[in-house]
């Protein structure tokens, strides 16, 4: 397919920073999203739902970069500015609730055109640092960065891991039998323990069944888990609008799949998933700790993995995070990379502090490793570490 000539008159650049303009470009945005096969995280509906419900709007600004050719939208660089820790960061729009980030590009749009758009976003200012994370190896933004005439941003040391289940099983039962004997036994023991409290049912929530009660239950369980961990998340606050709005986007796209595990009518585990491009993606999960002896989260996971394979899906993606259950069941993992760079002196100083802290930490870890490798008598006499007193 022919690319656009990289002349200014061939395309028009725009930076969207207002609610009104964000709403106006919805149809053109989603048309490009459907053509380009983007994930739901890059859809206009997802970004708009996030922007409408995200808390702390006073500390945020939109920076949605667009490339037009006439009335046709050819590329979208969905960015936003957020203030935290005294700095303004340029990052992906909806980064709070998106596991994978990327640019949307028509095949006819060149890397040079996107580079010009990036330069315009940087020139517009308003931020101290850019930090674009969760970049998949096969993502379009990665390809644009690495192109000879591409953006060429600096890689950052911060990475994340996504865990996935993929294989040549034709049925869920085959996948189950491929698990270790211990894993199969743990599943059966878990179900048996749950059945001591009543009938256990695994089910996919019908599309015509209201999701509200399940989402309320999910939020309650998440708040309890967060409190026990000493953390908070605005997404799960009672009455917070973001979670229902995002789930509604999944439902409207026909992608939503909510799985529940019920014990005598009580929901003991929940997984809010969605299907795209032949992959079942596990977006949000939780379980009731009062039923922990039966491992309801593990039972539900093994049930929906089997369901997914039976439906002909090629992969189950647990998305970001290195939780033990994800690593345990994954057959493959991908590393999500990031880029970072300064725009202001304040940003440069912040990066210098970060790099210095990292260098000091690496040096300390190397020193501890060297000491751990020494015989006990030699380690006791290392400089800076007094030898034990003799008695």
Question: Predicted regions span which residues?
Answer:
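Aromatic (often tryptophan-rich) hydrophobic motifs at membrane interfaces
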Residues: 68, 76, 98, 106, ...
């Amino acid at each position: 397919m022919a690319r656009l000539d990289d002349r200014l008159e061939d395309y028009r650049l725009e930076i969207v920073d207002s609610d009104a303009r964000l709403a106006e470009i919805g149809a053109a945005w989603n048309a490009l999203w459907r053509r380009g096969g983007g994930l739901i995280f890059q859809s206009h509906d997802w970004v708009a739902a996030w922007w409408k419900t995200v808390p702390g709007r006073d500390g945020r600004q939109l920076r949605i970069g667009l490339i037009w050719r006439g009335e046709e939208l050819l590329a979208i660089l969905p960015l936003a500015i957020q203030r935290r820790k005294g700095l303004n960061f340029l990052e992906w729009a909806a980064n709070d609730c998106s596991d994978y980030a990327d640019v949307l590009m028509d095949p006819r749009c060149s890397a040079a055109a996107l580079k010009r758009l990036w330069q315009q976003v940087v020139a517009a200012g308003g931020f101290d640092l850019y930090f674009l994370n969760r970049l998949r190896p096969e993502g379009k933004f990665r390809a644009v960065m690495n192109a000879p005439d591409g953006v060429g941003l600096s890689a950052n040391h911060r990475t994340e891991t996504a865990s996935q289940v993929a294989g040549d099983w034709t049925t869920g039962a085959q996948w189950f039998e491929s698990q270790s004997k211990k894993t199969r036994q743990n599943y059966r023991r878990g179900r048996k323990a749950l059945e001591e409290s009543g009938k256990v049912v695994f089910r996919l929530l019908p599309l015509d069944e209201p999701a509200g009660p399940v989402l309320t239950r999910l939020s309650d369980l998440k708040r309890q888990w967060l409190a026990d961990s000493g953390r908070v998340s605005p997404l799960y606050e009672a009455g917070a609008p973001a979670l229902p709005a995002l789930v509604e986007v999944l439902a409207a796209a026909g992608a939503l799949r909510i799985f529940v595990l019920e014990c005598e009518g009580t929901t003991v585990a929940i997984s809010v998933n969605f299907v795209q491009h032949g992959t079942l993606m596990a977006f949000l999960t939780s379980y009731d700790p009062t039923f922990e002896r039966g491992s309801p989260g593990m039972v539900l996971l093994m049930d929906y993995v089997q369901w997914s394979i039976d439906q002909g899906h090629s992969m189950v993606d647990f998305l970001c995070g290195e939780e033990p259950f994800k690593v345990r069941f994954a057959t493959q993992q991908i590393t999500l990379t990031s880029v970072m760079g300064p725009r202001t002196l304040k940003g440069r100083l912040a990066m210098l502090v970060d790099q210095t802290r990292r260098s000091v930490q690496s040096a300390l870890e190397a020193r501890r490793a060297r000491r751990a490798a020494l015989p006990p008598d030699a380690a006791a006499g290392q400089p800076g570490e007094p030898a034990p007193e003799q008695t």
